[in-house]
Amino acid sequence: MKIAFLGTGLMGEPMAFRLLKANYNLYVFNRTISKTERLKKHQAKIFTAPEEAIKEPQLIITMLTDYNAIVEVLFRNKSNFKGKTLIQMSTIAPQESLLLKERIEQSGGEYIEAPVLGSTQQAESGELIVMVGCNSETFNRLKKILKNFGNSVIHVGDVGKASALKLALNQLIPSLLSAFATSLAYVINKGIDINIFMEILRKSALYAPTFDKKLPNMLKRDFDKANFPLKHMLKDINLIYQEFQNNNVNTQLVECVRNILINSVEANLSDKDYSALYNIIHPEK
């Protein structure tokens, strides 16, 4: 089976490799061509124009930065989607997903959303959580392909529902870490043994695994290996902030986290791992 895969960044590349491992014929496009080199060495077909990459395959998967990038790549040359299925896997707003559905269907194609939750390591090992928005018939037909990315493939509901759920979950990522970073900064400033702090935290209902995962980065202030770049986290929080405003959800907590991320970007931490927000919460003396 031929699959077009558009977007081979931090998450897209390991996800594309999962499809190659499953012996699918992969037709790849990325706006930065150098990010396709490893896939090319493993027999993926590389294209310099998205319309060429999607010409033959009946199934198209996008893992691009945001809605604007998706629109630019898919529609810049009036590509024909007749008889094709598009699986959109990026984190975008529900309304943006519905707009894509409308445009793809107007062109004779089929659209589903399938955002994922997990790290680059989980993308490599095929342990992502895949949230799917489409009708039941389409979900059952495409579930086998989506299981290449993770065994947990969940039908959330119609298009828009999975995108909304992804935003709800992504809101927790910087919120949890900001709270942890704040407590960690206070513990350090008070001269309390960090090992004691972590020992008690791990034994409590307050603990989240991400605390231990990001603790070494924070203590060393080493954020160069970006599992999730801070600029992308801010992109998601901006979407979440807008969605909460539009859906009668108090935004005070999100505003605080958003301000921390904005300050992080202004401190030239955009391309660092999002745990670099620690530098804003606990500035170096």
Locations of regions flagged by a protein language model:
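Rossmann-like NAD(P)(H) cofactor-binding subdomain of soluble oxidoreductases
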Residues: 48-55, 59-61, 66-128
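Helical "substrate-binding/catalytic lid" subdomain
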Residues: 161-284
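Rossmann-fold dinucleotide-binding core
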Residues: 92-171
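Hydrophobic beta-strand scaffold residues
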Residues: 26, 46, 111-112, 153, ...
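Hydrophobic residues within alpha-helices
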Residues: 15-16, 35, 100, 145, ...
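NAD(P)+-binding Rossmann beta1-loop-alpha1 motif at the extreme N-terminus of oxidoreductases
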Residues: 1-63, 82-85, 120
